[in-house]
């Protein structure tokens, strides 16, 4: 194929609803047309560290991510080559040995907290979206997710939020809002915004045909 896939970056604070927005956009297209890449899958390999040391890693800092590999994979997908995406184990705080094959599609969504903060990623994107949600809503969502899905204790989630998540949000994530083409308030519940974005993507796909 000569045309390049459309790359869409979706970011926002932890618990903002960016995953909900991403999944809702994906739901509006045929499965063979769209794929989602989670930045979380590209946390660095920490096999050389003990589990006690891994727990202390600042996972909301740019240094926690293997951005070089993510950029490489996005470029390969842009040239219609499949990639082997890492699989991350949130309970062990490390990559799994197996990987997931991701086939190139006409529309590629990359979703994560630092997607717009990282210039190397940002420069590849055709559409840049920031999901903006109140801090109190985000912390409640984070509590529910990390306790239910990631095996964390209430105390550990609260401590991590106060000492790491919130400071990193103010330092890296919130400032990246200025790079967004579209800012979505109310997260994944903003149907009007999602309708507009989906309509714009469909127009871009038609123009590239």
Swiss-Prot record:
Q: Does the keyword Transferase apply?
A: yes
What is this protein called in UniProt? Uridine kinase
A GO CC annotation recorded here is: cytoplasm
The source organism is Clostridium tetani (strain Massachusetts / E88)
Record-linked SUPFAM superfamilies: P-loop containing nucleoside triphosphate hydrolases
Instruction: Note whether Iron occurs among the keywords.
Output: no
Amino acids binding ATP: 12-19
Q: In which pathway does it act?
A: Pyrimidine metabolism; CTP biosynthesis via salvage pathway; CTP from cytidine: step 1/3; Pyrimidine metabolism; UMP biosynthesis via salvage pathway; UMP from uridine: step 1/1
